[in-house]
């Protein structure tokens, strides 16, 4: 992920950054096609997800896919804004970690995705973890930046 834009999956506080560095993270989105329905339902849902961020989409497909979003809401929230506690991304912004567009979203719904950031606690000293935490936090919290 981009560490400079201030959009964090698990929280961008120094404490959360350090926790991520020490313990690592496993991101898991299971395949959701069976919960969504038919391949046509998955395609419609993909257009609804695109609509959440104002991305180009087919309005009719998006309206048909809206009711299928219930399968996504447990992790991404009913509003699609994500849940940092789960590492579920915000679907209403223009940040697409694993590709953008109908094909990429459909593939994610059909196949799911597992990512891992390995724990660094066995590789770094306490001092190194502190310095790295400050560095990563500072990359997205530059002096004078308005947020």
Language-model region placement:
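Membrane-embedded segments
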Residues: 1-8, 12-15, 22
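Axial heme c-ligation environment in periplasmic c-type cytochrome domains
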Residues: 2, 22-42, 57-60, 86-90, ...
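Extended non-catalytic domains of envelope/secretory-pathway proteins
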Residues: 8, 43, 51-54, 66
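Short Cys/His-rich micro-motifs in 6-15 aa windows
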Residues: 9-10, 96-98
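Extended intrinsically disordered, low-complexity coil regions enriched in Ser, Thr, Gly, Ala
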Residues: 11-13, 84-85, 101
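Sequence/structural segment immediately N-terminal to covalent heme-attachment motifs in c-type
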Residues: 19, 57-83, 93, 100, ...
